[in-house]
Amino acid sequence: MASEKVTALLEELKGLTLVEAAELAKEMEEVFGVSAAAPVMVAGVAAAGDAPAAAAEEQTEFTVILKGAPADKKIAIIKAVREVVAGLGLKEAKDLVEGAPKPVKEGVSKEEAEAAKAALAAAGAEIEIK
């Protein structure tokens, strides 16, 4: 529960007009030496404007996704999945291939993702890297 003083102050603030509220915000910025909106707006604009370019440059972890496996190449793809994913059993690899689209490797470096993509694509799998 808020004290009576806080409750009374809150009721006073509710009664302010929009112009009075703007004046209050400006005075509070001057008195306390803070800025209410500038850092948020600058960060928001920079993040929104640079997001696509920054995401492409800064991505360090990738996910290799098995999008599809042609029926006539499933055996080769299952073998390739077992080579790419260490410690994966035959049944798990078969379930992964038959359950496509599914991630094969997650949180890997670009080089590792490219190597996995190359091995799986060579076996005939449809692969995507995100």
From Swiss-Prot:
Domain of life of the organism encoding this protein: Bacteria
Keyword Metal-binding: no
GO molecular function: mRNA binding; structural constituent of ribosome
Swiss-Prot/TrEMBL keywords: Ribonucleoprotein, Ribosomal protein
Coiled-coil stretches: none
Any one Gene Ontology BP term: translation
Intrachain S-S bonds: none
Gene Ontology cellular component annotations, sorted alphabetically: cytosolic large ribosomal subunit
NCBIfam families from the UniProt entry: L12
HAMAP family: Ribosomal_bL12
Family: Belongs to the bacterial ribosomal protein bL12 family.
Role this protein plays: Forms part of the ribosomal stalk which helps the ribosome interact with GTP-bound translation factors. Is thus essential for accurate translation.
Quaternary structure and interacting proteins, as annotated: Homodimer. Part of the ribosomal stalk of the 50S ribosomal subunit. Forms a multimeric L10(L12)X complex, where L10 forms an elongated spine to which 2 to 4 L12 dimers bind in a sequential fashion. Binds GTP-bound translation factors.
Name assigned to this protein: Large ribosomal subunit protein bL12
Native organism taxonomy: Bacteria, Bacillati, Chloroflexota, Chloroflexia, Herpetosiphonales
Gene name per UniProt: rplL
